[in-house]
Amino acid sequence: MLTNIKHGKIDLSCIADGGFKPYKDGKIWSDELNRAFKTYREIFIPAGRYYVDRSLIVPSDTKIYADEHAEIILIKGVKTLLLRNESVIDGSDYKIPDDAPCDENISVCGGVWGEENEERLGYGVSGRFDENDTFHGVSTCFLFSGVRGLTLKNLVFRAAAGFACQLGRTDGFTIENIRFENCFADGLHVNGGVKNGTVKNLSGHTEDDLIALNAYDWDNSSINFGAIENLTVEGVNCGDGQNVHKSFRIQPGIYPYKNGEKEDCRITNLTVKNVSGVTTFKMYLQTPAYTDVPEKEIGVGRIENVTFEHISADTTAPVDKQPNYLSGNPVTGNFATFEIGSNVKNIRFSDVAVRLNKEKYPNSYFMTVGPKSQYIEEKHLELFDPYVSCAAENIRYKDVRINGQIADDLEKDIKIVEFGKLYPSSLPFGKGKAVCIRREK
């Protein structure tokens, strides 16, 4: 039973020590935590270990403060996610109305939030919305979808088998000082309908994108499709070590709903600064791998008004260890620090330092523009989208350095990709173009 209630606040150290289900070196806290989140505006979780055997639900007007030595752990074998907000709606099949219910004013600050996992388990296996996998696009430890006013600060995510934190349909947010420890998929996975926010100081070990801004995404990776607007991302540092994936994804697209409506999953007004340890910024459309033709007709998306400042990238080897990149295939083996396979307008680079190994990989560049392909002939399987045609317009740069040398003419380090007929296909193969590249003084 909860005791010592004062002014809408509770310290969990006041909970009577009885009635808990034992687990390993501690106890199962699911009921007590959910009761506290539902009943009190402010909850303090002191240092200690808190095991959880089902999802924690956070309603509006809830502030959770956890001691830095508090560990809230989803126990092994639980298929559902660790924590989510209350008013989640699945927007996979139909557009969510603008006036759909949202939660408001949620904060989670401090603590270690983790799982007892040792590998990525796969979509629908861990991080589910519920036991029945009702919202199949949810695959995460934390989910915030349908929130106005969100704060996440000073958190550690540990051993997440799916995404560490999945975000969608959120307006007005601050995410700051987040560390990932041995997380096996994406770190921060941002989907559509997200606007007016700041992300600051992300670091650590993830085995897929450290941060993904996926306005368009696969059906097994999102329940929110739509624009990402007015976002600043500052202070991103990919960790080192075995299996760390050093990528930052920025993915727009045109998403088709079941009723025939289409969603412009654009990304506009984005500033990215103070980034290190990243190999590649993935700014291209990538649909699920397919044979013959993609499962859905996904349109090429648009990115407008994006700035990269104070970036340090090591692209001396491809981030994706596919055979065509490693072998230097002259047609499909091009890779770059900035890989564009979307329609990009108004992109600016300032104080960007890139390392390339042109001796080993002469097909490596500062930027590529155009389609990508990795075709596995014996399976007739395509991993990328070679039919993409796109353009990068109004590219401005200042103080760009490649292998320590100032780039006076960046156009020489931009590869325009154009595919002829790579293999038998009913789809036309794509091409890229770059328009108006100029150096600022």
Functional labels for PLM-detected ranges:
Residues 1-441:
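Extracellular/periplasmic carbohydrate-active domains that bind, remodel
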